[in-house]
Curated annotation (Swiss-Prot):
Family: Belongs to the prokaryotic/mitochondrial release factor family.
Protein origin, superkingdom: Bacteria
Annotated localization: Cytoplasm
Record protein name field: Peptide chain release factor 1
PTMs per UniProt: Methylated by PrmC. Methylation increases the termination efficiency of RF1.
Assigned keywords, A-Z: Cytoplasm, Methylation, Protein biosynthesis
PROSITE patterns in alphabetical order: RF_PROK_I
GO molecular function: translation release factor activity, codon specific
N5-methylglutamine: residues carrying this PTM: 237
Role summary: Peptide chain release factor 1 directs the termination of translation in response to the peptide chain termination codons UAG and UAA.
Predominant location category: cytoplasm
GO cellular component term, pick one: cytoplasm
Length: 362
């Protein structure tokens, strides 16, 4: 392993001991924000410390195996010759696992996020597919122990959604969902199709990390046009009796955000402002990414409708993830929320790209 990486790891081990000592200080739990930050850092460092211990053990095993090759005993030499390939591959695996842990982390990966799904080409069928996608993500959120709640929606005329925006709260939400942004295409026979012909429809998905209040872009109140209106849809007796729903227009960019999820106008306004802040921050991040002119492919999509990332082919039960040339014939399970079979390979490919970039620059 590169000596500079070893030095970095030794520094992290020292930091692990420092954090452990700080967590043992009397009264540390009285400052909840500091305590949570230290606990989170300790858990991350603990994983690296254990991985480094496994790497050192693999190094020792390889050295011991090489020494056995020099033994006088022919049986020992033969045994060492058999064990050598496994000892080498184990060390390589442990080294790669450590390198992945040392990759620069996106600080937003631990954030909650907003999930936006919009029907595109395909009319009613596109809206129905948007509903299917929302159900898929809702099932996935349940599996992960996350909480998903609708912020605003515009129902389709024959089911599904013309547009739905949801908030997803939980552990590592953005880090796992960020690869979902882009164009999703469906190929299937609509229920209304009497001739049995396969139609193609599309939806766009955008995943935006929630911006913590302390980091939110400053928005000038004079740049906002705020309208109130009566909520529509499910909600019992309260519906359409008060103007609790909020529509905020950001005049410089033309961005419009609506929220009618809460009965309180104040809460709806706070939610809408949070979505607006996330969209403005995402637009700013996208400008920075474009300015970097990176030669590496960007697996994290922008949510642009022209950026087709995935095709769902119902007649063949096939899902095609175009960015990494992944084809899976388990569409039924995926639509029921079994998304890890796509998300995990995407993360691995993303990490491989990062490792390749580090190797080029080292």
């Amino acid at each position: 392993m590169n000596p500079s990486l070893i030095r970095k790891l030794e520094g992290l081990i020292e930091r692990h001991e420092e954090v452990q000592a700080m967590l043992g200080e009397p009264g540390v739990a009285s400052d909840q924000d500091r305590y949570r930050a230290l606990t989170r850092e300790y858990a991350q460092l603990e994983d690296i410390v254990h991985a480094f211990q496994r790497f050192r053990q693999a190094e020792e095993n390889l050295e011991a195996t090489k020494l056995m090759l020099e033994e006088d005993d022919a049986d020992l030499r033969e045994m060492a010759q058999e064990e050598l390939p496994l000892a080498k591959s184990t060390l390589e695996e442990q080294e790669q696992a450590l390198q992945v842990m040392l990759l620069p982390r996106d600080p937003k990966d631990d954030n909650n996020c907003y999930l936006e799904i919009r029907a595109g080409a395909g009319g009613d069928e596109a809206a129905i597919f948007a509903g299917d996608l929302f159900r898929m993500y809702s099932r996935y959120a349940e599996r992960q122990g996350w909480r998903i709640s609708i912020v605003s929606c515009n129902d389709g005329e024959h089911g599904g959604y013309k547009e739905v925006i949801a908030k997803v709260d939980g552990e590592h939400v953005y880090g796992r969902l960020k690869f979902e942004s882009g164009g999703h295409r469906v190929q299937r026979v609509p229920e209304t199709e009497s001739q049995g012909r396969v139609h193609t429809s599309a939806c766009t998905v955008a995943v935006l990390p929630e911006v913590p209040e302390a980091e939110q872009i400053e928005i000038n109140a004079n740049d906002l046009k705020i309208d109130t209106f009566r909520a529509s849809g499910a909600g019992g007796q309260h519906v359409n009796k008060t103007d609790s729903a909020i529509r905020i227009t950001h005049l410089p960019t033309g961005l419009v955000v609506e929220c009618q999820d809460e009965r309180s106008q104040h809460k709806n306004r706070a939610k809408a402002m949070s979505v607006l802040s996330a969209r403005l921050q995402a637009a700013e991040d996208e400008r920075h990414r474009a300015a970097e002119q990176s030669t590496r492919r960007n697996l994290v999509g922008s949510g642009d409708r022209s950026e087709r990332i995935r095709t769902y082919n119902y007649p063949q039960g096939r899902l095609s993830e175009h960015r990494i040339n992944l084809t899976l014939y388990r569409l039924g399970e995926i639509m029921e929320g079994d998304l890890d079979c796509i998300i995990s390979p995407m993360i691995q490919e993303y990490q491989a790209d990062q490792l390749a970039s580090l190797a080029e620059n080292s």
